[in-house]
Every structure is written in structure tokens, then in C-alpha cells.
């Protein structure tokens, strides 16, 4: 009984510390490229500092927005190490390590040097469309071998398979190293179910910029944002206002950026946000195929929206 009490106390402290780090705004940072497809380290550093100076709480490295699907092997390690070096402990860091082969994800856990990182973001398996039990067993396997606390990521519009509310709550209850979900289903019935039924120490984080205000009103504890690559200060201010219950003030920022958010995703992400960053002089408008830049017509619309801010 004494041992169990000590364990539960330590686990509570562990999760309180995580909540302090990850309650607020995280940024799914883009990876800056040169025209030839090589990584543009100078621009990458500018974006890192831009986000940190904008007072966001943490940075997610090599998520979908970071074009992780086309960054490979040794290069991924170089990116992880570079961001950690430039960050120098200023904000919390999350490493994107996910995939549709459980064994390969576990190998990544073993081989990547994650010095300077506080957590891992792991997307649910994509393309092979496992059933709910397969999804649970995948995350259970990650939970057993992870070197860091995990944020699971549900984004069915990209993966092709929704991790249901019931499965997410089961993971939250049974996988103690998985402390949060980045929930991007856009399904408020599911979001409400998770928030209502999750353990008290499990965090729900918005994965949808345009509905973050509504998700926090329902009980979410922050956002992992694409938009905050370009507008970190205003967007993190909006999230902090929501978390403080100041929704009337938060709405002003929410509606200020609503058209900009729509434009960032209209022709795919990260195509949209990189168009904004290129206009700001933070990085070139370059990608790795099959991701491509937005049309010139849409880019002109982006320029006009920026002038209207």
C-alpha cells in the first residue's frame, strides 16, 4: 500500500510537470529548405527564434508541417539536434516520431538521440487502416518502450482511420506514458466524449487552428498550431486568453485570423504557411516533392490578406 501511494504521488507530480510545460501553444514548426531541396539551416534558425520570441510554450519538430515524410534517417537526427542546439532550453521541445510500422517507430525510439527534448508526438498509423484494437495495441507497444512521455496524434483526414473517442480514452487509462492527445478529428461529439471520460491528468490538445477557441471552451488545454509559425505572438496570446476564461477578448484575435487560417490550408499545408513565411522573409518558398507551393493566384490572395492585418 505504501509503495502504491508513493508511485501514485510520483506519477501525479510527473503529470503536473507535463501540464505546466504543455498547457498553451505548441508550434508544429516547418522545415526550411533551399531551392535544391537541401535544408536551409540559416532560415530554420530564424523561424525557431521567431517562434520563441513570440512567447509560444513549445515547439514540435518533424511533424506533418515539418515535412517529416520526406526527411530521412541521419537527416532527421540532424534536425532534432539542430533545433535542440538553437533552442538552448528556452522552450519545451517535442520530437515527431510516428509511422505505420510499429517496429520501425520503436526502432526510432531506440536510435534517435533526443537530448533536449521533453516529449514525443506520435501520429496514429496511416494508410494500412488498422482496426481499433490494432490502433490500441500500437500505442500500447509505444507506451512500453518510449524514452519520453508521448502525445498521441489523431488526424483522420491524413491517416485514413479515426482513433475513436472510446479508443483514445482506453489509451489514456491504460498507457501511463501517453499523457495527451493532439485531437484533430474536427468531430465535436468525439472531442466532448474524450474530455468527459478521460482521466483527470490526461491532456486534450487541439490539432485544429480554426476551432481551438471552441475546443478550449469545451475543456481542451491548448493547441499545436500551424498558424503560429507565422503569427506566434497573437496566436499564443489568444490561447492564453482562452485558458484564462477571457473568451470575449480571445474572440477578437480568433476572428482577426479566421480568413488567414483558411488561406493557409486552402491549397494544402505546409504549402500555405510557407507562403506566409516567405513573404515575411523568414524562409524560401521551397518544399520536397510531392509537396508544392500554392498557385500564384492564391499567393496573391495571401499578400492581400497580410496587408489587411
Specify the residue positions occupied by each region the protein language model found.
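Short, basic, low-complexity termini and linkers enriched in Ser/Thr/Gly/Pro
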Residues: 5-15
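Active-site beta->alpha loop and helix N-cap motifs at the rims of alpha/beta catalytic domains
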Residues: 18-160
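C-terminal alpha-helical cap/extension of soluble enzyme domains
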Residues: 21-32, 50, 54-56, 65, ...
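Alpha-helix N-capping/helix-start residues
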Residues: 35, 41, 73, 165, ...
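A general structural signal for well-ordered alpha-helical segments in protein cores
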Residues: 44, 76, 80, 105, ...
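Catalytic alpha/beta core domains of metabolic enzymes, predominantly
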Residues: 144-145, 158-265
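Glycine-rich phosphate-binding "P-loop"
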Residues: 154-155, 177, 288-289
Amino acid at each position: 500500500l505504501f509503495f502504491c501511494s508513493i508511485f501514485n504521488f510520483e506519477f501525479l507530480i510527473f503529470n503536473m510537470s507535463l501540464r505546466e510545460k504543455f498547457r498553451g501553444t505548441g508550434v508544429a514548426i516547418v522545415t526550411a529548405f533551399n531551392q535544391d531541396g537541401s535544408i536551409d539551416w540559416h532560415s530554420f534558425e530564424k523561424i525557431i527564434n521567431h517562434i520563441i520570441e513570440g512567447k509560444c510554450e513549445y515547439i514540435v519538430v518533424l511533424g506533418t508541417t515539418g515535412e517529416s515524410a520526406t526527411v530521412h534517417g541521419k537527416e532527421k537526427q540532424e534536425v532534432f539536434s539542430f533545433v535542440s542546439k538553437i533552442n538552448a532550453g528556452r522552450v519545451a521541445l517535442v520530437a515527431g516520431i510516428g509511422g505505420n510500422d510499429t517496429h520501425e517507430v520503436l526502432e526510432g525510439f531506440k536510435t534517435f538521440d533526443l537530448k533536449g527534448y521533453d516529449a514525443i508526438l506520435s501520429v496514429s498509423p496511416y494508410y494500412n487502416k488498422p482496426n481499433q484494437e490494432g490502433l490500441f495495441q500500437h500505442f500500447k507497444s509505444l507506451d512500453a518502450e518510449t524514452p519520453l512521455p508521448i502525445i498521441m496524434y489523431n488526424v483522420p483526414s491524413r491517416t485514413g482511420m479515426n482513433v475513436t473517442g472510446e479508443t483514445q480514452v482506453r489509451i489514456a487509462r491504460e498507457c501511463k506514458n501517453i499523457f495527451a492527445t493532439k485531437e484533430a478529428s474536427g468531430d465535436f461529439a468525439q472531442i466532448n466524449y474524450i474530455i468527459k471520460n478521460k482521466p483527470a491528468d490526461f491532456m486534450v490538445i487541439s490539432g485544429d487552428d480554426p476551432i481551438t477557441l471552441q475546443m478550449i471552451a469545451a475543456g481542451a488545454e491548448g493547441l499545436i498550431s500551424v498558424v503560429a509559425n507565422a503569427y506566434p505572438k497573437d496566436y499564443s496570446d489568444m490561447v492564453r486568453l482562452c485558458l484564462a476564461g477571457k473568451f470575449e477578448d480571445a474572440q477578437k484575435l480568433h476572428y482577426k485570423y479566421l480568413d488567414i487560417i483558411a488561406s493557409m490550408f486552402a491549397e494544402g499545408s505546409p504549402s500555405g504557411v510557407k507562403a506566409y513565411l516567405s513573404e515575411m522573409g523568414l524562409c524560401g518558398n521551397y518544399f520536397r516533392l510531392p509537396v508544392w507551393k500554392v498557385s500564384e493566384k492564391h499567393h496573391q490572395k495571401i499578400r492581400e490578406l497580410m496587408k489587411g492585418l
